Amino acid sequence: MKVVIVGGGAGGISTASNLRKIDKDCEIIVLTRDDKVAYSPCAIPYVLSGTIKSFDDIVMRTAEDYKKKDIDVITEVEVTAVDSKNKTVTYKSKSKQKTIAYDKLVLATGGKPFVPPMDGVELDGVYQIRTIEDGIEVQEAMKDAKSAIVTGAGLIGIEIAFALKKQGLNVTLSEMMPQIVPRSLDKDMSDILVSYLEMEGINVVLGKPITKLIGDGKVEKACFGDEELIDADMVILATGVRAELELAKMAGCEIGRWAIITNRHMETSVEDVYAVGDCVESKDLILGSNTISQLGTTAVRQSKAVARTICGWRSNFNPVLNSMVSKVGKLEFGAVGYTSSFAQQNRIRPIVQKIEALTRARYYPNAKPMDIKVICDSEGRIIGCQIIAEERVAERIDSMTLAITEGLTCFELSNMEFAYAPPVSMVTDPLILAVEEVSKKFS
């Protein structure tokens, strides 16, 4: 069996690795436009901040490493054609063009940065950050810059803004929505983050899109709304990504609202063509509708399902909740499931409780405040959770991910057993305090 994988990101390279673990004999070819594989794009902001020393440190394996596992990773090539009828893929490098056959094809083409429609995006000094090469370019530009604007206040935008500020730049973080991280946090929770960012010296501009970038060949200012101007030696576009669908369309795959449609085995509508990662739509666990889940964790889980399916195991990829966690400076923040505003938009009447607790016993040194928001539906079933604290956020988001996945109500979770010791927790965990409080709203 010959498996060709298009894309060397988290979905593609993980598919190759998982295939090799199951099938020691199949031929595996990975085609990627990057010169590096098996690196963590999520770590790029932390290299820019200086927390991680070098971009080399976030490259886990090279093409040569995969060669030792009998996986042929062909770098710096562009796939130009997919013929699903004759089961061939054509790619070109700097020096040649080649067509190869496949038995199974995996599309892991990822996403491409969304460029907002505004005048001046073609100016020098305007950057997107998707790859290590993008990160290196920004790192070089930072050396001569005094001011920067990051537009788009999702996870990556916030992390990059903080990284630039840590390196001494005057930073403005702009978001056209009236809040930051709008997909994951409600406004009252995101306001906690805004206060922290402003305390750290970042200028946060909300509800005002950048209408144009101004400069003579190189960006000098950004115009917000009709007239507000802010100086900028560099501008980072962190406005999200859109699924890369050209090859999927060429292959004849069914395309949904955002990305490629697959079944739970990661099979597309075309026989022997599969898809994983940012180019794929996923099922929403709560409503069962299609959604987009452009997370590295999603791509890796999909890669396990597709590898098993290709090898005859017919493995399933489960619906998603888009659980996330991040850290800027001292502050960790995470979320899973629905915000109360998203629930309302989807005709769910949310029952909500927000509390403040501590990360450890109140008498123990360095106990940190923890803000928790729990969202339930009208029957008490937990459908969302948001947490902000200086520590211990990720494991509680994971606990709530399991609770939502299992369909637990706030009443059921309130009886859950948690471990306790004064240096690491409260005798009643903050999650239990939160669900106990929201439970009272049903009495």
Annotate the PLM regions.
Residues 58-59, 147, 156-212, 293-298, ...:
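Rossmann-like dinucleotide-binding cores of NAD(P)H-dependent redox enzymes
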Residues 122-145, 217-223, 228-308, 399, ...:
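FAD-site-proximal beta/loop scaffold in flavoenzymes
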Residues 7-10, 130-131, 151-154:
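Glycine-rich Rossmann-fold phosphate-binding loop(s) that bind the pyrophosphate
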Residues 25-27, 67-69, 73-93, 100, ...:
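A Rossmann-like FAD-binding core segment of flavoenzymes
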Residues 262, 276-339, 424-442:
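A conserved FAD-binding loop/helix module that cradles the flavin
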Residues 1-72, 163-185:
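Beta1-alpha1 glycine-rich phosphate/pyrophosphate-binding loop at the start
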Residues 6, 100-110, 230-240, 303, ...:
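Short hydrophobic core segments
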Residues 6-10, 20-25, 33-34, 239, ...:
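Flexible, glycine-rich terminal cap/loop adjacent to redox cofactors
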